[in-house]
């Protein structure tokens, strides 16, 4: 079993007297900034001119600067921007101010692992990655708890990089729940694999495939939506709470028997071979190169795929059905 580290393993004093710049104030950015602030750390926020998030950050009591100003003023710089914009922002607004001994932080290893960002050898480069969305990172912190985090060291220029990463994780509440040490390579490759094969790519393809099969067989689209999309949350909640065992213990015997006898016919040896192929594309950097080139060319293919997916019948059916769900109206 991997070792977990907790509050007593991390030294928050390493952040004392330091200024941490949070670059970006989205889902993760606001949670990191506010949690660190509430942990007694001096936090500033770096945003581009005209950012709609500036007012929110200022109303929360945070000092907002341009990205370049924040990078220049900070001892620690946490980049919480979309993967595809990090290289340009780093190159033009952060790199010129990375003086010796500073700490460059990430919450995902994509740009470091695939060589899009190449820091100077005189700075620590670390990763602190909460395994939950920003609103959960913030809410659990306020409740005196936390969200588990991954942490990693890519470059240790000061001899303190590992301790510094753990201190940051403590500052955002991660060590209350437990933090797990990894590497930039492992985090990046497993994260991309999970997104593509299971959580996003695999699940959305499975949902659409099931929906289309029922509709093409003459069943009402609304029933197909309920059975193949809506009830996914009911099952996933059980799995998150207690693993596959709790899910199977909570469903009917009919459903469990169907799971055990028919499920393996969906994920076949051919499917597993494709999973291995996708993993290899991630490991070799093929996916990263494809994604970077797509963004550099203005995202024509990405935009077309988004448009095509938005026009899928499941979206129209879902929109009408969700209007009936009173528990969603407040959201």
Curated annotation (Swiss-Prot):
- For the keyword DNA-binding, the answer is no
An example of a Gene Ontology BP annotation on this entry? Answer: L-valine biosynthetic process
Per its record, the protein catalyses: (2R)-2,3-dihydroxy-3-methylbutanoate + NADP(+) = (2S)-2-acetolactate + NADPH + H(+); (2R,3R)-2,3-dihydroxy-3-methylpentanoate + NADP(+) = (S)-2-ethyl-2-hydroxy-3-oxobutanoate + NADPH + H(+)
User: Hey, which pathway is this one from?
Assistant: Amino-acid biosynthesis; L-isoleucine biosynthesis; L-isoleucine from 2-oxobutanoate: step 2/4; Amino-acid biosynthesis; L-valine biosynthesis; L-valine from pyruvate: step 2/4
Listed binding positions for substrate are: 252
Cofactor stoichiometry and binding?
A: Binds 2 magnesium ions per subunit.
Superkingdom per UniProt:
Bacteria
- Protein name stated in the entry: Ketol-acid reductoisomerase (NADP(+))
């Amino acid at each position: 079993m991997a070792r977990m580290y907790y509050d007593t393993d991390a030294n928050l004093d390493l952040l004392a007297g330091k200024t941490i710049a949070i670059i970006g104030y989205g889902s993760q950015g606001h949670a990191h900034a506010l949690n660190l602030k509430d942990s007694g750390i001096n936090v500033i926020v770096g945003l581009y001119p005209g950012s709609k998030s500036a007012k929110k950050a200022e109303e929360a009591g945070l000092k907002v600067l341009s990205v370049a100003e924040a990078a220049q003023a900070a001892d620690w710089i946490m980049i919480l921007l979309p993967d595809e914009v990090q290289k340009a922002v780093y190159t033009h607004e952060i790199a010129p101010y990375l003086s010796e001994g500073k700490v460059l932080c990430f919450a995902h290893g994509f740009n470091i692992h695939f060589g899009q960002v190449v820091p100077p050898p005189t700075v620590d480069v670390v990763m602190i990655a909460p395994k939950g969305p920003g609103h959960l990172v913030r809410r659990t912190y306020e409740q005196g708890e936390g969200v588990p985090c991954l942490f990693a060291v890519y470059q240790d220029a000061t001899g303190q990089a590992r301790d510094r990463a753990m201190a940051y994780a403590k500052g955002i509440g991660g060590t209350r729940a437990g933090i797990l040490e990894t590497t930039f390579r492992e985090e990046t490759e497993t994260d991309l694999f999970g997104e593509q094969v299971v959580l996003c790519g695999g699940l959305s393809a499975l949902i659409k495939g099931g929906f289309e099969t029922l509709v093409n067989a003459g069943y009402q689209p609304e029933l197909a939506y309920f059975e193949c999309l809506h009830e996914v949350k009911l099952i996933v909640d059980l799995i998150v709470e207690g693993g596959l065992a709790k899910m199977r213990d909570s469903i009917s015997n009919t459903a469990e028997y169907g799971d055990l006898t028919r499920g393996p016919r969906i994920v076949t040896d051919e499917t597993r071979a494709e999973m291995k192929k996708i993993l290899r594309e991630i490991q070799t950097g093929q996916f990263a190169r494809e994604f970077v080139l797509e963004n550099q060319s203005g995202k024509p293919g990405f935009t077309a795929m988004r448009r095509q997916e938005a026009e899928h019948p499941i979206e129209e059916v879902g929109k009408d059905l969700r209007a009936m769900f009173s528990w969603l109206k407040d959201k």
